[in-house]
């Protein structure tokens, strides 16, 4: 049976047309945020393809009205006026509560409340009203192809003189707050041209910024980590954090503004799709695949992985941003990595709160990571036990505990396995754990290249005729590269391709004008010599075996490591700006299929590595956003009645 996810219209494709021929576009799923502005002529509609984007386009085309900027969709219910698109003058609008004597009105906006899952609420257009139903058109709520000129027909209940709209959505029934009407404004004549007054034209706001800020906290929470949480407790033990220490010392953190946050999301989502497209391109060509130096015997299994295991959990881009030049660049995609995930999703927010930075004007750049991590597991279509395979490494340990926590929250059974003593072969040669449970799904921190090397080494040591018996020790390759090609692995084997830097010249050649890409080549070209270049191994980690050469030919930096025997690629030099003596790399997280968080690693050298410290990153938002619920409206109405009685 096809799932709702499999039936979803792809991002950016038309789901249907509302009355008047107004298109509604798919946002893919409700947790996806593209970071891309939608501008229709000179009208800023919103972000592709959120619910407000459709509502603003619909109101403009249907009534020649312009919805003002709102923080969240739910805040439309608080509006008292909108703008006449032709004159720019204010036009009255009226909010009517759901569940009152007023019957819903055609061509009004239906507003949904904040809830725990979606504090921003939702907005839809009411396109038709019957006695027992209303029909709505919207985006980012349902994702199917429309059968008619509306997205859904919702029940309208009329009891004891009260009209109530309900929205049965999958396994829950939502009750909208109410609807916003435009009583003084008839529908626009479709034969008349759309006109937008100059005062309503979109104007680009502030430029993107990234600052390193230093301050001395005025207070400090004593117990800022939760030592009852396994991941946080392990992190505290490893990093030597004294959570009882109230000492106030000078501290530093990074702060980006909303424009840079939007650039991270926009470029992160775009680049993720580019890397996926390039991966498909590479896997379809033996000539290109050979550039990745993967032994040919593994190619069929690699292609099988791509064809049968589309789901992924995490990947991290390395980004850089120069505020002076306003350039934003991607260095590479660590598509098979979860390193610094706990720091981004939990630690930086709890540290910020402990030193008083969480004052409502900023929020953590990793605030969505935990919820999206759980969602990624829910969407991965996994059943049974998930074995978490890690090396005997502290960072891998607390990272695995964090990811396990959210896999468990998604309803999965999990088991942490350090090295391979946990496993043995049963009588049939199947790898099972100490409970006798066969390994069918794995999350791992091991590099796929390590598994391939182990597989080749094992063949030499065991011989070609070896068959597993219960007395044999289980190795990494027996799990990841055993006879079961349908073993679910996160990250899947095909992630070798986007993680390999041999993909960088392919990406650049396919998208040479993309503003976030750097020129890359398999050979040192005259152009790269002119700009300066970075030489790095196609397979490597944490900045090892990297050489940075200036345009003058001088070597600016060089790192050692274990990857010097690998093939190399050459990438255009992008000079990291110095901030207070430090150089910062932005780690941009794609979780599931959506960009959702950013972290910072900084160093006093221009090559960041394993020992480069993680620093907190805050996003400046200005005034704090507040949810709006039925309870909030009830309290406001009660207060208004009470105030009236007192007078």
Curated annotation (Swiss-Prot):
Changing residue 207 to V: In allele TRS-2 and strain Silvio X10/7. It comes from the Eukaryota. Bifunctional enzyme which catalyzes the formation of trypanothione (N(1),N(8)-bis(glutathionyl)spermidine) from glutathione and spermidine. Converts spermidine or glutathionylspermidine into trypanothione. Can also convert aminopropylcadaverine into glutothionylaminopropylcadaverine and homotrypanothione. Also has low amidase activity, hydrolyzing trypanothione, homotrypanothione or glutathionylspermidine to form glutathione and the corresponding polyamine. Changing residue 288 to Q: In allele TRS-2 and strain Silvio X10/7. Signal peptide: none annotated. Changing residue 237 to G: In strain: Silvio X10/7. The keyword Nucleotide-binding applies. Changing residue 397 to Y: In allele TRS-2 and strain Silvio X10/7. Changing residue 291 to V: In allele TRS-2. Subject to high-substrate inhibition by glutathione. Monomer. GO terms for biological process: trypanothione biosynthetic process. Changing residue 624 to P: In allele TRS-2. Keywords: ATP-binding, Ligase, Magnesium, Metal-binding, Multifunctional enzyme, Nucleotide-binding. This is Trypanothione synthetase. Pfam families: CHAP (PF05257), GSP_synth (PF03738). The record marks 316 as: Transition state stabilizer. It catalyses: spermidine + glutathione + ATP = glutathionylspermidine + ADP + phosphate + H(+); glutathionylspermidine + glutathione + ATP = trypanothione + ADP + phosphate + H(+).
